[in-house]
A protein has these predicted regions:
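Family-specific signature for flavin-dependent thymidylate synthase
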Residues: 1-265
Length: 265
């Protein structure tokens, strides 16, 4: 697939930067690195993520499809900016194209897919010989074409992006892209490594809220409706409202509950 290059302009100590900025507002000592680090962790653990907009991430996304980059562009929180490889000035007559897994595992589908790419490349070369400018012939380029993007974003935006794009129902290439970004950040500095591996701040939304909001859940977490029922049952058990509780139980559940209550006595 593609690769992520974290640029040197990226904040090296994101946790400390968060703590320092928060400390200024709280009247704290911002000259002490250890205090800044602890304060930054407290912000993360308390969900005070406005401070997470201060750590900046500069990166190059290279070799991912134009299609997934279009989806990447929908994450606009925190004022990110980006530049994409030009289709006007760069010659794409021999462009690379992403082959989806469901295509590559089928020999006939693979042949059909690669032939379509080859036909497009041939058409681009023919148009070039006919004197058609690249900015016009580029209209033929497919969404699956590999491209390169320079991005500036921030920690908070990436946390939110992970909530959406690490979901098992997210587009497969974006899941790969998101994991590649996380892996590259973990390698960039020790504080980023702590954020990724120790504090695990990048996770799907179901792991954050404890239930799944998707209509077609993968089953890793209960749906919101199931979770609401569990909460109701928990309250009934806590209040020992057995009359209401019996309405939720099968005959086997009732038998097991009687056994459990007899053991407690």
């Amino acid at each position: 697939m593609g690769k992520i290059i974290i640029q040197s302009l990226t904040t090296e100590k994101p946790i400390s930067v968060m703590g320092m900025e928060a400390g200024i507002c709280w009247g704290g000592d911002v000259t002490d690195e250890e205090k800044n680090y602890k304060r930054g962790l407290d912000c993360l653990q308390s969900g005070h993520l406005r401070t997470a907009e201060y750590p900046q991430v500069y990166m190059v996304l290279d070799g991912y499809s134009a299609r997934v980059i279009r989806e990447f562009y929908t994450h606009i929180a925190g004022g990110p900016t980006r530049l994409q490889a030009s289709t006007r000035y760069i010659n794409y007559k021999d462009f690379d194209c992403i082959v989806p897994p469901k295509v590559s595992k089928d020999p006939l589908a693979t042949i059909t897919y690669l032939e379509a790419i080859e036909n497009t490349q041939t058409a681009l070369q023919t148009l070039e010989k006919a004197g058609v400018p690249k900015e016009d012939s580029a209209n033929l380029l497919p969404l699956g074409m590999a491209t390169k993007v320079v991005v500036r974003t921030n920690l908070r935006n990436l946390i939110d992006m992970a909530h959406q794009r690490l979901c098992s129902r997210a587009y497969w290439e974006f899941r790969i892209l998101m994991n590649d970004i996380i892996e590259a950040l973990a390698y960039y500095s020790s504080e980023w490594e702590n954020l990724v591996k120790q504090h695990k701040i990048f996770k799907p939304k179901c792991a954050v809220c404890g239930f799944c909001e998707e209509k077609y859940s993968c089953g890793a977490y209960p749906t919101k409706e199931q979770n609401d029922e569990y909460i109701k049952l928990g309250k009934l058990i806590k209040n020992k409202d057995f009359t209401s509780l019996l309405l939720y139980l099968t005959d086997e559940d009732k038998h097991n509950l009687v056994k459990l209550l007899s053991l407690e006595k």
